[in-house]
UniProtKB/Swiss-Prot annotation:
Its main location: periplasm. Gene3D superfamilies: 2.70.98.10, Immunoglobulins (2.60.40.10). This is Glucans biosynthesis protein G. The gene is opgG. InterPro entries: Gal_mutarotase_sf_dom, GH-type_carb-bd, Glucan_biosyn_MdoG/MdoD, Glucan_biosyn_MdoG_C, Ig-like_fold, Ig_E-set, MdoG_OpgG. Disulfide bonds: none annotated. The keyword Transit peptide does not apply. Pathway: Glycan metabolism; osmoregulated periplasmic glucan (OPG) biosynthesis. It comes from Vibrio cholerae serotype O1 (strain ATCC 39315 / El Tor Inaba N16961). Involved in the biosynthesis of osmoregulated periplasmic glucans (OPGs). Transmembrane segments: none annotated. It comes from the Bacteria. GO terms for biological process: beta-glucan biosynthetic process. Residues 1-35 form the signal peptide. The keyword Zinc-finger does not apply.
Amino acid sequence: MIRVSSAVQRHAQKLIVLFSLLFGASLLMSDNGFATDIKNTNASSPVNSESTKPTKAGEVKNVVRFAKTGSFDNDTVVRLARQLAKKPYVALKDPLPESLANISYDEYRDIRFKPDSAVWKADGLPYQMQLFHRGFFFQDLIEIALVEGNQATHLSYDPNMFTAGEVLQQNLPTEDIGYSGLRVHYPLNSPSYFDELFVFQGASYFRALGKGNAYGLSARGLAIKTADPAGEEFPIFRAFWVEKPNYDTNLIVVHALLDSPSVSGAYRFSIRPGENTRMDVEAVLFPRVELSKVGLAPATSMFMHSPNGREKTDDFRPSVHDSDGLLMINGRGERLWRPLANPSTLQVSAFMDNSPQGFGLMQRERDYANYQDLEAHYEKRPSLWVEPVGNWGPGAVVLTEIPTQSEIHDNIVAFWKPAQPLAAGSEYRFSYHLNWGAQPEANPQAITVSRTASGRADIAKPTPKRLFVIDYQVQGAKPAQMPEPKVRSNAGVISNVVLRDNPANNGYRLSFEFDPGEVTLAELRAELTLQEARPVETWLYRWTL
């Protein structure tokens, strides 16, 4: 059996608010541990660059412009991307038949892939691949090829693979209109069910699941000009080559060709399902223009509210978010935890580093009681941990937080921004691991932040002072001595700093008051100092009016 989740619905409902970003504050993590103000500054043509035109009913026209067929190896897509970058970018227009061009969300949702048509189902493999139809938001024609024995073959569109509503079923095209994406199923949670494992659909977006997870945040191939006042550029995966997996392996490999006005690229994803599903990513980029505002290993998520910042919400649910914090382990091995926020204005923070060990958007709150949502089950959303391979050099982890009033809007973006621009006409190779799961980054000895809450410091009378409460979880035995707390701010006044044992979680609770005075933005930092050598997370937070 195949258990079909709501991946299509979630992709469709998650409207991309990044297209209309407004001006916001940008800050940079400086050597003193605080953020300082920074200024917000501002593909080759395919083999056949003609638009695909619908053919007459009954006539089949295979569309192969990017997805090279025939002999295939690990450098095939790299060679295609290199050739693509030498020519001007061509914005392809692949009009859908009128019966599909303007369908509604409900009509698109009714177009369902038939599980019995899944690729490799008849082969008895542990993986089965399904395809997504074009339509609604997903208008781009995506080419897909299957690789077996070093040979790639084109996977043509077949209307018989889909069911649709009564009217639409009669009007599904017979010509090769391609697909809008793919998803792969695997018996992740039970030997008798093929659960969704990962999805590639929409621009360069993709997502995956660890054991027991439900879809939440997404990753992207590349981010360009995120939070730029002139608008963001969204590269697209034009074509995929999916290698047929072996019978006795837990590995499946997907190759992808990335294209945009600014860059072309070749990606190789080696995917291993498990408690934490791991993707080994190899990316080769060929900039057409200088890329000064580029984001590597970008993740996109949603944060609406939590116990830290509920004053602007009227919701029966205590928390609503796909991720609740940004975790970083910098090049010096320091663990940094930055709770997410739903700010009043666009906020962009940059945390300077040299050769980061890892970073990612985490969902740490795993108790249903803290969400109370019987449908969304935010407690099951995966975290995503990025592990760079090799020395990525100087740069910054950049966090973008966008105001939102609805959970259907992704409003959180995190990625690595190199310090030096990527030069036009050059070739860049980056490798990294993406780990999806409930605890993709777990240190058995670390003292970690488990919860951040804030509220008015004096409940008896109005006051600008804010009370912050931070809970720390101790992994393993507690230290023999109580840590020494230190709380700092680059503006305003910190007072009443108290650290006490928290028997409820075998950890500690740190509380303090913050008086912003006349400022509208401040960077807060809390540290616990131990007498013994043990990793302890440093808590960072941006307070805004």
